[in-house]
């Protein structure tokens, strides 16, 4: 009888299970696990005996046989030639699980060719956001932005969020500066930049067919074209060729106002910087890029995808599109950060192999870029950025712990039909209601421009 009562009490407790309790327990378990691993590693290094001379000189189980017991030589006198195998590029075992679980990583400089190649790539990519600091470029961008419209929309949205928060006795979800960037996002996607798949024929405006790449012309190279795609008009009577330079220079993007994901993220990030925002340009190794903007109101970095018009939806790519991602590195004028854990919550489901370099090398390169970008800053700014790094690392670890806790909680029988309890793939919240209200008011006043973006990527 007592056993049945005890069993019913346990069942009742499981029904009232709180995910936050499991999250805290999991984080404590991981801290203890890391501590014990470090202790064992230190103990093993302290007590490991050094090999004696006899042990060093004694043959192992795979040592060559003694000459007296060696098989007779082959009848031919030709020297033995070992088989030659083609050289394979060095691959590293994927450290996705250890990276996402926040296990301690000791930074280590790159030693092999593959690690050095990845280090050079990250250093080249880290230069991109430094180009946004050109005062002439920022002034040119500001001259193209309808500031009065953006500030008016931001003020309206900010007041709506404040009223909604006051009605429930809470705090507004976003601050005024966040609303300014959100208004910029709507204008940039709807009125300024155009997505290009196959550029139309400039002679007859008919669709074109891809013909591959072609070398850039000197004029295109001077304007920052990294490569040029060639297209042929689909109309047989026309047959004209259309060139589509892929510009990386933001100056040129202000003139062309068209491109694909790379051009969208590059130009939009610069516009955010022109409005005074702290900006990150995020590179994904699976050929995608986007933007992060720092929210002073929430004291964290917010995901922004100008091409998709997405705001604060970091799980869009992995869980919304089903993409598997390995590296997501954010670059800014203050350094670099590996933000993969923000966009890949479940390494088993959505994580790709991280085998371009050991995790120790990746961490070392990240710190190297930070030191390079911050070496001329004041001690006060360096300390502020260091605290931000610590706060963000805590945030990223919480994402991983919460995702694992939610998966464990979903395994419980009473939660199998309730779905996920953590953050939604496309969060619906108060700011979306405010955005819908603003969009409706713009349609009524004829204020909003057309959306020139095309389908496809």
Swiss-Prot record:
Gene3D superfamilies assigned: 2.20.25.10, 3.10.620.30
Sequence ranges of Pro residues compositional bias: 61-86
GO BP annotations listed: glycoprotein catabolic process
Keywords from the named record: Metal-binding, Zinc
InterPro entries assigned to the protein according to its UniProt record, in alphabetical order: Papain-like_cys_pep_sf, PNGase, Transglutaminase-like
Sequence ranges of Low complexity compositional bias: 87-98
Binding residue positions for Zn(2+): 201, 204, 233, 238
Superkingdom: Eukaryota
SUPFAM superfamilies associated with the record: Cysteine proteinases
Xref: SMART domains: TGc
GO terms of molecular function: metal ion binding; peptide-N4-(N-acetyl-beta-glucosaminyl)asparagine amidase activity
Region (Disordered): 30-111, 410-457
Short name of any one Pfam family annotated for the protein: Transglut_core
Single GO cellular component term: cytosol
PANTHER family: PEPTIDE N-GLYCANASE PNGASE -RELATED, PEPTIDE-N(4)-(N-ACETYL-BETA-GLUCOSAMINYL)ASPARAGINE AMIDASE
Family the entry assigns: Belongs to the transglutaminase-like superfamily. PNGase family.
The protein, known as: Protein png1
Species: Aspergillus oryzae (strain ATCC 42149 / RIB 40)
Top-level taxonomy: Eukaryota, Fungi, Dikarya, Ascomycota, Pezizomycotina
Gene that this polypeptide is encoded by: png1
């Amino acid at each position: 009888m007592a056993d049945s009562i005890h069993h019913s009490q346990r069942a009742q407790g499981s029904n009232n299970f709180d995910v936050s309790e499991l999250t805290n327990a999991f984080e404590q378990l991981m801290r203890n696990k890391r501590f014990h691993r470090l202790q064992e590693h230190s103990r093993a290094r302290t007590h490991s005996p050094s090999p004696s001379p006899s042990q060093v000189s004694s043959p192992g189980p795979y040592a060559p046989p003694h000459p007296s017991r060696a098989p007779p030589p082959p009848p031919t006198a030709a020297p033995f030639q070992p088989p030659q195998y083609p050289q394979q590029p060095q691959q590293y075992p994927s450290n996705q699980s250890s990276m996402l679980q926040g296990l301690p990583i000791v930074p280590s400089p790159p030693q092999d060719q593959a690690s050095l190649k990845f280090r050079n790539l990250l250093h080249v990519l880290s230069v991109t956001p430094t180009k946004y600091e050109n005062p002439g470029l920022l002034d040119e961008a500001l001259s193209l932005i309808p500031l009065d419209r953006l500030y008016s929309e931001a003020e309206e949205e900010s007041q709506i969020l404040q009223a909604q928060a006051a009605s429930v006795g809470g705090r507004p979800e976003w601050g005024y500066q966040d609303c300014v960037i959100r208004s910029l996002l709507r204008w940039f996607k709807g009125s300024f930049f155009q997505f290009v798949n196959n550029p139309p024929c400039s002679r007859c405006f008919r669709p074109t067919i891809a013909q591959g790449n072609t070398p850039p012309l000197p004029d295109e190279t001077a304007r920052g074209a990294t490569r040029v795609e060639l297209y042929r008009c689909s109309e047989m009577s026309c047959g004209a060729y259309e060139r589509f330079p892929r510009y990386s220079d933001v100056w040129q993007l202000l003139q062309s106002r068209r491109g694909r994901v790379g051009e969208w993220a590059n130009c939009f990030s610069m516009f955010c910087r022109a409005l005074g925002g702290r900006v990150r340009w995020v590179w994904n190794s699976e050929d995608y890029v986007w933007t992060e903007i720092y929210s002073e109101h929430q004291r964290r970095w917010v995901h922004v995808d100008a091409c998709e018009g997405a705001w604060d939806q970091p799980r869009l790519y992995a869980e919304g599109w089903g993409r598997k991602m390995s590296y997501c590195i954010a670059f800014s004028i203050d350094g670099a950060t590996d933000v993969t854990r923000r966009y890949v919550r479940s390494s088993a489901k959505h994580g790709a192999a991280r085998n371009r370099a050991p995790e120790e090398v990746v961490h070392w390169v990240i710190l190297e870029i930070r030191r390079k970008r911050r070496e001329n800053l004041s001690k006060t700014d360096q300390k502020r950025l260091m605290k931000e790094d610590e706060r963000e690392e805590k945030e990223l670890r919480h994402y991983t712990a919460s995702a694992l806790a939610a998966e464990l909680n979903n395994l419980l029988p009473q939660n199998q039909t309730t779905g996920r309890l953590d953050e939604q793939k496309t969060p619906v919240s108060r700011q979306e209601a405010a955005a819908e209200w603003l969009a409706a008011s713009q349609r009524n006043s004829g204020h909003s421009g057309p959306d020139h973006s095309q389908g496809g990527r």
